[in-house]
């Protein structure tokens, strides 16, 4: 690590501790030439996740899109913003833990529906109607009947 004061490349770590909810390490360093101290942060580099859409195009994973879809599905329902954000965070964590670099949008949609089904069935049906592109009332009824089993 190059000293920001004299550009010398040698330093020693004086103090080290977790920072940013344990997602980074904060280090206090001391330059071995000028003896000035400075702070550095060490963080694991995020691996970009690509979502494979239905038309086979790819786009970067965006947790905000999940949150936006959930907000629409849960509008005027007893589902809190915290619950919505927790679902999105759980899905992102699930994908990251599986070390997936590419994931089909269908898989994400199914994970969302699985979580919504346990929280609020009306929100689940709303989300499913858009996600599965229900064409008529019969498709709606089939989904509702499957919920009632």
Swiss-Prot record:
Cofactor note (record): Binds 1 zinc ion.
GO molecular function: ATP binding; DNA binding; zinc ion binding
Keywords: ATP-binding, DNA-binding, Metal-binding, Nucleotide-binding, Repressor, Transcription, Transcription regulation, Zinc, Zinc-finger
GO biological process, one term: negative regulation of DNA-templated transcription
Domain of life: Bacteria
Cofactors that this protein relies on: Zn(2+)
Stored InterPro entries: ATP-cone_dom (IPR005144), NrdR-like_N (IPR055173), RNR_NrdR-like (IPR003796)
Disulfide bonds listed in the record: none
unnamed Zn finger ranges: 3-34
Domain ATP-cone: from-to ranges: 49-139
HAMAP family associated with the record: NrdR
UniProt record similarity statement: Belongs to the NrdR family.
Biological role stated in the UniProt entry: Negatively regulates transcription of bacterial ribonucleotide reductase nrd genes and operons by binding to NrdR-boxes.
Xref: NCBIfam families: transcriptional regulator NrdR (TIGR00244)
Protein name: Transcriptional repressor NrdR
Organism from which the protein derives: Clostridium perfringens (strain 13 / Type A)
Name of the gene: nrdR
């Amino acid at each position: 690590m190059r000293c920001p004061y004299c550009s010398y490349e040698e330093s020693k770590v004086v103090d080290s501790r977790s920072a940013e909810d344990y997602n980074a390490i904060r280090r206090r360093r001391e330059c071995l030439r000028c003896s000035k101290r400075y702070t550095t942060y060490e963080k694991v580099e995020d691996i970009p996740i690509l979502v494979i859409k239905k038309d086979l195009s790819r786009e970067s994973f965006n947790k905000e899109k999940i949150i936006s879809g959930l907000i629409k599905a849960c509008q005027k329902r007893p589902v809190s913003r915290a619950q919505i954000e927790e679902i999105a965070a759980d899905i992102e964590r699930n994908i990251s833990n599986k070390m997936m670099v590419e994931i089909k949008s269908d898989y994400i949609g199914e994970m969302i529906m699985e979580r919504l089904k346990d929280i609020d069935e009306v929100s689940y049906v709303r989300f499913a109607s858009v996600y599965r592109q229900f064409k008529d009332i019969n498709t709606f009824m089939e989904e509702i009947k499957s919920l009632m089993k």
